[in-house]
């Protein structure tokens, strides 16, 4: 067992299954990535069940840059261009232009307004005219192959929603410490205990998908 795994509860399969159950019940989960990557933890909620109080928690306890993870198909359906033509960020984080609901919001920055924007974007019949640009919600485009293609929080979020049987749209924000520094695994685990949230890793999800997909291929 690695030092990282020793801080976590259960096996990778148990952690993923617990996270899927939590998401189905409308609860948040905490996902950390590789220590040699961003080495950060994100608080993640299903977009379709996100409440105003959960959004307020993302704003209060995290960095405040609340992101909406979407599939490539959804990004295209909403007509969202990428934030920049040539992405030179270290981990190729796929930000589109930021968005706001075209109706039902005031300044767009409150918790309720951001939830309104997210609900407008993930609606089954959502179209480009339902959103204004720019805004206070930051969509991220997930790679089609999920965490097996890119080991990022964006892909982990969409994969978790799919595995949970939810819309493949999730909301994330990086957890920060009270002093504004980024929370690392020990602080993420403490945060999870305080708020009764499952903590898992992107690597857990990679292993879980590989296990399930290998079983399906062998059947």
From Swiss-Prot:
Q: What is this protein called?
A: 3,4-dihydroxy-2-butanone 4-phosphate synthase
Q: Where is this site: Essential for catalytic activity?
A: 136, 174
For whether the record's keyword set contains Ribonucleoprotein, the answer is no
Q: In which pathway does it act?
A: Cofactor biosynthesis; riboflavin biosynthesis; 2-hydroxy-3-oxobutyl phosphate from D-ribulose 5-phosphate: step 1/1
Q: How is the cofactor bound?
A: Binds 2 divalent metal cations per subunit. Magnesium or manganese.
Per the entry, what this protein does is:
Catalyzes the conversion of D-ribulose 5-phosphate to formate and 3,4-dihydroxy-2-butanone 4-phosphate.
The similarity annotation says: Belongs to the DHBP synthase family.
Give GO terms: molecular function aspect only.
3,4-dihydroxy-2-butanone-4-phosphate synthase activity; magnesium ion binding; manganese ion binding
Task: For this UniProt record, give its keywords in alphabetical order, as a comma-separated list.
Answer: Lyase, Magnesium, Manganese, Metal-binding, Riboflavin biosynthesis
Q: Name one GO cellular component term.
A: cytosol
Residues reported in the UniProt entry to bind Mg(2+) 1: 38
Give the record's subunit note. Homodimer.
* E.C. numbers: 4.1.99.12
InterPro entries, from UniProt? Answer: DHBP_synth_RibB-like_a/b_dom (IPR017945), DHBP_synthase_RibB (IPR000422)
